[in-house]
C-alpha cells in the first residue's frame, strides 16, 4: 500500500500529561438516542472520551473538530481552569494543545486527516 493510501486509525489511548485517556467509538444510534451528543468526556478514572463512530469514520474536518473539542474538555479538567482568568486559560490551552499536537499518540491521526482533505 502506498504512503498516500495509508489509513491512520484513531488511537485507542492517548497519554497526555498525567493522564492516559481511553478513546471509545460508540454507534451513532447510541450517541444520539442516549443524550444527543457527538462526543463525551468522562472526568473520572479511568478517563475516557466517547465519540460517535460515524463521525470519526467519515474523517475530515468534522472528525477533527469533534476530537479537538473533547480533548479541550480534558485540558479544562487537567489544568483546573474552572475559576481562572483569561490569561491563565489561554496559556493553559496553548500548553495543552501544543502537547496534544506535538507529542501525543493523536498526532499521526490528526496529520493524516489534515493531509487527506
What are these language model-derived features?
Residues 1-2, 18:
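Juxtamembrane/interface helices at transmembrane-helix boundaries
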Residues 2-12:
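Short acidic, Pro/Gly- and aromatic-enriched capping/linker segments at domain boundaries
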Residues 10-61, 74-78, 82-96, 117:
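Active-site scaffold of zinc-dependent metalloenzymes
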Residues 34-35, 69, 86-87, 104, ...:
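Alpha-helix boundary/interfacial micro-motifs
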Residues 66, 70-74:
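Catalytic glutamate of the conserved HExxH
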Residues 99-106:
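Acidic/histidine-enriched, beta-strand-rich ligand/metal-binding domains
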Amino acid at each position: 500500500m502506498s504512503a498516500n493510501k495509508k489509513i491512520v486509525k484513531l488511537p485507542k489511548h492517548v497519554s497526555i500529561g498525567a493522564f492516559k485517556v481511553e478513546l471509545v467509538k460508540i454507534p451513532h444510534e447510541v450517541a444520539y438516542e442516549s443524550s444527543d451528543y457527538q462526543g463525551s468526556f468522562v472526568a473520572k478514572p479511568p478517563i475516557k472520551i466517547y465519540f460517535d463512530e460515524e463521525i470519526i469514520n467519515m474523517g475530515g474536518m468534522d472528525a477533527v473538530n469533534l476530537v479537538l473539542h473533547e480533548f479541550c474538555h480534558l485540558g479544562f479538567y487537567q489544568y483546573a481552569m474552572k475559576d481562572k482568568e483569561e490569561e491563565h486559560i489561554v496559556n493553559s490551552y496553548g500548553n495543552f494543545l501544543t502537547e496534544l499536537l506535538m507529542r501525543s499518540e493523536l498526532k499521526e491521526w490528526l496529520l493524516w486527516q489534515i493531509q487527506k482533505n
